[in-house]
């Protein structure tokens, strides 16, 4: 067999029955239609235990790309942290106890949601209880979600935090993730969340629930809740400690570096002394903070096997998904392997991606076409549209997003045939195939379900249903490379 291989990941395009709110089935997509008619295809599971998440938990881009790149199921931080809370080992964690001994008040920040993509409410509340049992006053800095869960669900999670309120546990600030969890160096957003958390800017006399209700009445949903300080909160004190409870790294880096970093260049923090800081996981290799759940080494990965075989590879994506085809795809390793090239295409600078549903797909495709013409042995490319436009809740824009991806797929498949590439086309998780629920309410979160996988390769006439963990072994089989014992079985 031994073919050069192109792996295409169409982010956020999954499988659900046809409906008016399924952007995938509603789109005009001649390339996909042709693949359904003539290419071997099967469904792959992208959620729950099949990708190392709790049963029934929706998949996400980080987990999906890690699973694809590792070629096996990796139990995710979400599962590990939940187990540590359940069995009591987190309370005895030496890093946590050491941090506790050095700090007075504890500022505990995180995404207040059970979406399980960046955080989980049970982790945030579990840590609050642990620190209060250790005698600390705990000040909660709640980041409202509205993206991985319903856009008006924050009251439910705030109620859970309020149920814990005591002499030691209080809600200090609220901020929408649009401000507190940017990942694209939009420092004006981070600065607003920083000001509220670090200094108690934008005070309100409203209770947490009253404040959320006032924001809703102003037409502002959870993702975009304006940062506010509550209950007379006035900011950090020199003896305080700051804990960030999100486990996913990409949207934690900016806010944690702003609040905890000794040196910081995103904006002028004025006369600022950062507090002692504790991170849930490893957000960035350059961060000096202690970590509750350090990164486990994931090897071998697909990229590693290809590199060690002396072959060349190219990883392509636009900004929104660049970390996914590099850092996450390579098992949490930032540095490229030998003979691994990378192309980053800037994502369009728009407030929300429904304003430009094609995003940077044409440029991503151009870079991939160039890679095939240069003869890279393996290319992985991500199209972000289905996910990023799906998150806006705009069905018409999501349909346009699918059509944009379909156009670029047509160009890539034509060049792949010309240049002798095998093609594996799949997704990391679903999103745009379910834009509204059965009641007609907008859905902005990922779906719980399967995605399609198509394979165009010499001698492949049929593939099995399976999981994302089987993609890497399938690539290696097509490329004529041995599959490491740590990886799972291929799809044919």
Curated annotation (Swiss-Prot):
Its cofactor is Mn(2+). Transmembrane segments: none annotated. GO terms for molecular function: manganese ion binding; phosphoglycerate mutase activity. It is an enzyme of class 5 (isomerase). The active site is at 61 (phosphoserine intermediate). Substrate binds at residues 118, 147-148, 177, 183, 248-251, 321. Pathway: Carbohydrate degradation; glycolysis; pyruvate from D-glyceraldehyde 3-phosphate: step 3/5. Binds 2 manganese ions per subunit. It catalyses: (2R)-2-phosphoglycerate = (2R)-3-phosphoglycerate. Belongs to the BPG-independent phosphoglycerate mutase family. This is 2,3-bisphosphoglycerate-independent phosphoglycerate mutase. It comes from Wolinella succinogenes (strain ATCC 29543 / DSM 1740 / CCUG 13145 / JCM 31913 / LMG 7466 / NCTC 11488 / FDC 602W).
């Amino acid at each position: 067999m031994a073919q050069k291989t192109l792996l295409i990941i169409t982010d956020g395009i999954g499988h659900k029955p046809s409906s008016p709110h399924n952007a995938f089935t509603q789109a005009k997509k001649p390339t996909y239609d042709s693949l359904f008619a003539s290419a071997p295809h099967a469904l792959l599971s992208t959620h729950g235990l099949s990708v190392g998440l709790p049963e029934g938990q929706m998949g996400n881009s980080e987990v999906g790309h890690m699973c694809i790149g590792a070629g096996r199921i990796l139990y995710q931080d979400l599962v590990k942290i939940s187990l540590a809370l359940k069995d009591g080992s987190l309370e005895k964690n030496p890093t946590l106890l050491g941090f506790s001994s050095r700090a007075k008040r504890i500022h505990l920040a995180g995404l207040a949601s059970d979406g399980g993509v960046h955080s989980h409410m049970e982790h945030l509340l579990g840590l609050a209880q642990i620190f209060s049992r250790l005698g600390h006053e705990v000040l909660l800095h709640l980041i409202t979600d509205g993206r991985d869960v319903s856009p008006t669900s924050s009251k439910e999670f705030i109620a859970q935090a309020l149920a814990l309120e005591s002499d030691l546990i209080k809600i200090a600030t609220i901020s929408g993730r649009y401000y507190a969890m940017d990942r694209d160096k939009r420092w004006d957003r981070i600065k607003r969340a920083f000001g509220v958390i670090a200094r108690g800017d934008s005070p309100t006399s409203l209770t947490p629930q009253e404040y959320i209700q006032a924001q809703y009445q102003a037409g502002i949903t959870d993702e975009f809740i304006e940062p506010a300080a509550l209950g007379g909160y006035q900011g950090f004190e020199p003896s305080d400690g700051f804990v960030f409870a999100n486990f996913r790294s990409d949207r934690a880096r900016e806010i944690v570096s702003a609040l905890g970093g000794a040196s910081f260049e995103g904006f002028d923090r004025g006369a600022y002394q950062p507090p002692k800081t504790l991170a849930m996981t490893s957000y960035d290799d350059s961060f000096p903070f202690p970590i509750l759940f350090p990164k486990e080494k994931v090897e071998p990965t697909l990229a590693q096997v290809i590199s060690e075989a002396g072959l060349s590879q190219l990883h392509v994506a636009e900004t929104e998904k660049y970390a996914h085809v590099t850092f996450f795809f390579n098992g949490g390793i930032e540095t490229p392997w030998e003979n691994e090239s990378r192309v980053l295409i800037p994502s369009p600078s728009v407030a929300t991606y429904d304003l430009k549903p094609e995003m940077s797909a044409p440029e991503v495709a151009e870079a991939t076409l160039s890679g095939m013409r240069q003869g890279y042995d393996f290319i992985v490319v991500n199209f972000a549209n289905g996910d990023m436009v799906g998150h806006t809740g705009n069905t018409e824009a999501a349909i346009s997003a699918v059509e944009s991806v379909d156009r670029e797929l047509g160009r890539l498949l034509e060049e792949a045939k010309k240049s002798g590439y095998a093609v594996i086309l799949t997704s990391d998780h679903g999103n745009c195939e379910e834009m509204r629920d059965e009641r007609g309410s907008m859905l902005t979160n990922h779906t719980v379900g399967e995605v399609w996988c198509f394979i165009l390769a010499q001698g492949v006439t049929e593939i099995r249903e399976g999981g994302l963990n089987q993609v890497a072994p399938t690539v290696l089989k097509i490329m004529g490379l041995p599959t490491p014992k740590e990886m799972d079985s291929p799809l044919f």
